[in-house]
Amino acid sequence: MTKYKEAHDNYLDLHIWKRKELENYILEPQVLFRLSQQSNDKYEHFLKELEELVDTYEDRVFDQYAEHILKYRKIDVSTANAETRKYMKDMWTNLENKLALVGGKEFLRCLNNWFKQKFSLNLSISQIISEFQKDEFDNEIVEVIRDMIL
């Protein structure tokens, strides 16, 4: 039985987020760049450094994905690893995907440390959210909230 059918049978609305954790939805490079208070000509360099930072999490993402496959499917370790390698090859291709896959809570802690060291700034979740402009929120978040209200 799928999770959606089980939820429907129990009169529940189910939404499975596309990103790993809710915190991943505030990992928007443009917003983070504005919070760094750098001049616009430094944006490309900021993106490069941000991607280098998130790339340090690639092995953790691989391990978590393989562990998830092993937990919920009855396959052997080598098959789970092969599937994970393919998934990572397909998905770990750009900064947007990487920021969706990394553990958001853990990466936010790392990001805050990076901001302290590099920019002498503390970075909080509320600061990040406050920096968002209306059109920068992911459509998925907007649609889920709209569905909950209506």
PLM regions: where:
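Acidic, divalent-metal-binding catalytic cores of TOPRIM
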Residues: 1-150
